[in-house]
Structure formats: C-alpha cells, structure tokens
Amino acid sequence: MKALNVPTIDFVGKRTYAIVFSVVLIAVSIFSLATQGLKFGIDFTGGTLIEVGYKKSVDLSKVRDTLSDAKFKGANVQYFGSTNEILIRLEPQAISSAKLSTKIIRLLGDDVDIRRVEFVGPKVGEELTNDGGLAMLYALIGILIYVAFRFEYRFSLGSISALMHDVIITLGIFSLLQIEFDLTVLAAILAVIGYSLNDTIVVFDRIRENFLSTRHVDPEKIINGALNQTLSRTIMTSVTTLIVLLALFFLGGEIIHSFALALLIGVIIGTYSSIYVASSMILTM
C-alpha cells in the first residue's frame, strides 16, 4: 500500500488568524452565557416528565397546542421511540403526580396510556447542576496532572487551554441558539473533553518525538512538521466520527438531537483546537 505524502501546510504561520478567530468565538460565547445563559432542561431546573402512549401515530403540534391552551407554559413535547409514543416535559407543578396524570388524560383523551410520570424537584436539579460543574472541573484537573507527568508543564497548559476552548465554545453555541441543555448534553461535553484530549495527545507525542530527534531546529518548524505528519490521522478520525454523529443526529430521533449536536460541535471544534490552539500555546510558553 502506498504511503500518503506528508503535506507541507504552514499551520504555525497562520496561528495569528486562528488565535483571533478563537478569541472572537470565546468572547461571543462568554457574552451569551453571561447575558442569556443556558436553557436548562428539567434535569437541572426541576419539573415533571410524562411518557404517553397512543394506539396510533400522533401529531406533536396538536399535543403542544392542547397543553398550551391548558396553561402548561413551556411544555416540551417530542417523540419517544416511535410516532405513537411521546415524551412531555413540564415545568414544576403545584399538584401531585396522580392529579397531574388525570389532568393530562382528560386533556389528551381517554385512549392515551400514561406509561410513567417522573418528578424532579428543584433541589435535585440544583444538585445535578453542581455535580455536573464539578465533573467537568475534576476532569480538567485530572487531565492537567496526567499531561504534566507524561510531557511537561507547557504541554499540560496547552492541552487544558484547548479543552477549555472547546467546552466554552460548545456551551456558547447552545446558549446562543437556546438549545435545551440536559444531562445527555452534559455527558456529550464530557465525551468531547476525552475526544479532544486524545487528538491533542497524538499531536503532542509527535511534537515531543520531533524535538528529541531533531536538534538546533526552529521550534516552529518542528511543530509544523508534527502537525503535518499527524494531519491524515486527525482528518480520518474526525471524518469517520462525524459520519456516525450525523447518522445519530438525523436518524436517531428527536430525543437525542441535543446529545448528537453537542458531539458534532465538540468534535469539529476539538479537531480545530488540537491543530491550532494547543500547539500555539506551546510556542507562546
């Protein structure tokens, strides 16, 4: 099998443009997060989750209109598994689960089947928010320690900068578009951290090898060479991952749209940051 030719793209020479692009994205993301925040789902805000079954396919718009007319503001309705099963997310209600189920049946018709009713209290939602934030913090600290031991402090700070870059921009896009942020999206963010780190470490490994094998050469040339040598691997890994994620997004159903979207955004941003952000931080330090 014929080996692929190593490209000679001047990534390092274009790092100024990349830094400006990243700074703009981060600034917009932070501004959006500070002004309008994330649109948290009931996993974090508290509320009621109701799974409803129908004997035949149901029109979601009619269900939404029915709930809206009954003063259930902010009700989220989506298919769950098939077009005759729906999932309803409601804001916290001042009535019991039994009374709420009775009210929903009265609104939607006697032929519906209430499969389950789950209540998430505001306190539980607050605990999940705190735990989610701590999970990301612990992940970043663990990565900082791991990379510092495996490489050196410059590599460690470079990897953390790239990961924070990926997380902030992904959260910023969710804030800008006001896409619901629930536990599945949090799981996707943590997965993005792992994916981006793996990509970055592959690049760092090659940079370290090149520094050890090539003496008295401009660091920019060494890093540029490493980025070009790992480029085919980076592109092939990202493209195959994106193909799977696109299939999940378009064919996986509405229930996992946010999860798949977070991964799509994270993989694209993570691939970009492993090439430009992480390596730029090494040169800066």
Where are these predicted regions, by residue range?
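A structural signal for conserved, well-ordered secondary-structure elements
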Residues: M1-M285
